[in-house]
């Protein structure tokens, strides 16, 4: 359920979405998709390193809370988000329940893990805000995993 490694498939999907939805060039979309995935992988690995776990039940609960918020129109840009979700469900060829109960569980597991890490780091380092802490996590990961990062960049066609 938790993926702590780089994914070429996820990179390609996100980069294509950035090109389609935001009109980015392929190069800019690749840069942004890489940056987002680096952030995610660094944070997830840090959470794992400090012993943070997320159960399937926690991920499911987060998924259901988000679904309820959207259905009750308690989130911003509700209509746009719901249209995007409906389009994705149709493209995937799955039911709405399968989307929320299975397909999105990994994303919500990552979200819960990020929330738990944020709480952990702020308790450990109360003088720093989350953005500073997150930047340090990414920098440490970039140094310690430079070989893996460079290999992934080669695989996705980045320098």
Curated annotation (Swiss-Prot):
Keywords of the record: Plasmid
Domain of life (superkingdom): Bacteria
The protein, known as: Glutamate-rich protein GrpA
Organism expressing this protein natively: Alkalihalophilus pseudofirmus (strain ATCC BAA-2126 / JCM 17055 / OF4) (Bacillus pseudofirmus)
């Amino acid at each position: 359920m938790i993926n702590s490694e780089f994914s070429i498939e996820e990179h390609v999907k996100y980069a294509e979405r950035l090109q389609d939805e935001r009109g980015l060039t392929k190069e800019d979309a690749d840069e942004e998709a890489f940056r987002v995935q680096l952030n995610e992988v660094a944070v997830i690995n840090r959470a794992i390193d400090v012993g943070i776990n997320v159960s399937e039940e926690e991920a499911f609960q987060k998924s259901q809370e988000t679904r309820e918020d959207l259905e009750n129109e308690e989130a911003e840009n509700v209509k746009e988000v719901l249209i995007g979700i409906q389009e994705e469900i149709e493209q995937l060829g799955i039911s709405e329940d399968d989307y929320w109960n299975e397909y999105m569980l990994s994303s919500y597991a990552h979200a819960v893990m990020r929330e738990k890490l944020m709480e952990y780091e702020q308790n450990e380092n109360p003088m720093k805000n989350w953005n500073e802490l997150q930047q340090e996590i990414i920098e440490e990961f970039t140094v310690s995993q430079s070989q893996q990062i460079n290999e992934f960049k080669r695989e996705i066609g980045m320098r």
